[in-house]
Design a protein with these regions (language model features):
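Generic beta-strand/beta-sheet core signal
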Residues: 50, 92, 143, 237-239, ...
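Amidase signature
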Residues: 1-39, 200-367
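Conserved hydrophobic/aromatic pocket- or pore-lining residues that grip, position, or stack substrates
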Residues: 50, 82, 261
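Short, basic, glycine/proline-bearing loop/turn elements
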Residues: 61-65, 114-116, 343-353
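Extracellular/periplasmic catalytic domains that process cell-envelope and extracellular macromolecules
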Residues: 40-42, 83, 133, 228
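Short glycine/serine-rich loop segments
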Residues: 75-76, 80-201
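Short, well-ordered beta-strand elements within core beta-sheets of diverse protein domains
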Residues: 28-30, 66-70, 182-189, 339-344
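Enzymes and membrane/adaptor proteins characterized by extended Gly/Ser/Thr/Asp/Glu-rich
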Residues: 40-75
Length: 367
C-alpha cells in the first residue's frame, strides 16, 4: 500500500548553491526560482524558505553537514500555500546547525553576517532569512521558532517576525526539534507583509498536523493590522528586565519601544509574573525528552502521532546518523547525552513534572 505524499504542484529548475559576491552575507543555501499561481494574495512577492523546511528538488541541510546529500522530494504545506497564493519562491536560506542556536555562527556552511554591519551576527536560528530580507534580496521568508528563532534574528537585523500561536501554522514538511515548541512563522520587511504572509500560511492542514483542530482558520491579518493599536493593552513583564545575562541597553531599547506604543494609542502597563523567571527552565525540561526522540530516532519527522511523516527525509536521516554520527553538531550531542543521563537516572519523572508545571505557568500569564 502506497503512503500518502505531500503535493508538488509547480515546476522548477534544478537550481544551485551561490558563492562569492552572489552570497556575500553567507545567507543563501540554495537558489532556484519556483513561480506560483498567476494571481493571488502574494502575487509579485519574492519569498525564501528556511533550510529546515522542505522544498521539492532542493537540498534541505538543516544547517548541518549530516544532511549533506539530501534533496527534499515534497513541498512543505507552507510552501504549497505560498505558491498557490501567487508567491515566487527564490530558494532556501541558511539556518543554524539543527536550528539549535540563537547566534548566526553554527551553520556547516559558515557564519551568516548581518547586512546592517557584517561584523555582527544576524541572530538565529532563522539567520539567513533575516539577512536576505534586510539585504533586499527577498520580500518575505518563512522561518521556524522554538525558543526565539524567528524573533531574535528579526530583532537583531531589523525586520519583522512573528511566532504565531502554537499550531496556527502547520508544521507539515518541516524539520522539528520538539512538537510542543515547534512553530513556523512569517518574516518580512514590513508589518503589513508579515501579516499578509501569515494570512496565507495559517489554517488547518487536513489532519496532517495533530496540533490543529478542524475548525482552525486563518484570519484577514493584513486588514486587521491596518486598524491600529488604539486601546490595545500591553503588559511589560518586570521579571524580563535586569535578569542574569540581560544587558541594560537592551532593556532600555524595549522600554523605549513601549513608550512609542503609548504615543500610538496603546495602553502599556508594568506587570509582574513571578513564574516568568523560571519559565525557560521549565520549557527546556519539558521538551528535552522529546528532542532526544527527534534526534535519536525520527529526525525530520519527530514524534508526530496521528500526523504526517516525510518518509524520504526520515530514511536519509536514519542512515546518515548511523554512518556519519560525527557530523551531528556539538550542541545536539550535548543535549542528547544530557537527556540519556536523565532517562537512565530518573526515567521521565522530571520531564513529566515539567509538563505538569506548564499549566500553572500558562495560567499565570493569562491572569
Amino acid at each position: 500500500m502506497d503512503s500518502p505524499r505531500l503535493p508538488v504542484r509547480y515546476p522548477r529548475a534544478q537550481g544551485y548553491r551561490p558563492s562569492g559576491d552572489e552570497n556575500r552575507y553567507g545567507a543563501w543555501q540554495w537558489k532556484c526560482q519556483v513561480k506560483g499561481a498567476a494571481t493571488g494574495k502574494l502575487a509579485g512577492k519574492r519569498v525564501v524558505i528556511k533550510d529546515n523546511i522542505g522544498v521539492a528538488g532542493m537540498p534541505m541541510l538543516n544547517g548541518s553537514a549530516l544532511y549533506e546529500g539530501y534533496v527534499a522530494d515534497e513541498d512543505a504545506t507552507v510552501v504549497t500555500r505560498i505558491l498557490d497564493a501567487g508567491g515566487e519562491v527564490l530558494g532556501k536560506a541558511v539556518c543554524e546547525n539543527f536550528c539549535y542556536s540563537g547566534g548566526s555562527h553554527t551553520a556547516a556552511s559558515g557564519p551568516v553576517r548581518n547586512p546592517r554591519n557584517p561584523d555582527f551576527m544576524t541572530g538565529g536560528s532563522s539567520s539567513g532569512c533575516a539577512a536576505l530580507i534586510v539585504a533586499g534580496e527577498c520580500d518575505m521568508a518563512v522561518g521556524s521558532d522554538q525558543g526565539g528563532s524567528v524573533r531574535m534574528p528579526s530583532s537583531w537585523s531589523g525586520c519583522v517576525g512573528i511566532k504565531p500561536t502554537h499550531g496556527l501554522v502547520p508544521y507539515t514538511g518541516a524539520g522539528p526539534i520538539e512538537q510542543s515548541i515547534d512553530h513556523l512563522g512569517p518574516m518580512a520587511a514590513s508589518s503589513l507583509d508579515c501579516a499578509l504572509l501569515l494570512e496565507v500560511i495559517a489554517g488547518y492542514d487536513d489532519s496532517r498536523d495533530p496540533r490543529q483542530v478542524a475548525s482552525l482558520q486563518s484570519k484577514p491579518y493584513s486588514e486587521l493590522v491596518t486598524e491600529g493599536i488604539h486601546g490595545l493593552r500591553i503588559g511589560i513583564v518586570g521579571e524580563g528586565f535586569g535578569a542574569p545575562g540581560s544587558e541594560g541597553d537592551v532593556d532600555e531599547a524595549v522600554a523605549l519601544a513601549a513608550r512609542s506604543l503609548v504615543k500610538a494609542g496603546a495602553v502599556v502597563e508594568d506587570i509582574l509574573i513571578p513564574v516568568h523567571a523560571e519559565a525557560m527552565t521549565v520549557m527546556f525540561a519539558s521538551s528535552v525528552d522529546g528532542t532526544l526522540s527527534t534526534w535519536s530516532d525520527q529526525g525530520p519527522a519527530g514524534p508526530n502521532p496521528g500526523g504526517y511523516h516525510p518518509l524520504g527525509a526520515i530514511r536519509f536521516f536514519q542512515e546518515a546518523r548511523k554512518s556519519r554520527a560525527a557530523d551531528l553538531p556539538d550542541m545536539a550531542k550535548t543535549v542528547m547525552l544530557f537527556a540519556h543521563v536523565m532517562r537512565a537516572r530518573y526515567g521521565n519523572y522530571y520531564s513529566a513534572k515539567a509538563q505538569n508545571l506548564l499549566r500553572p505557568i500558562r495560567a499565570a500569564y493569562d491572569e
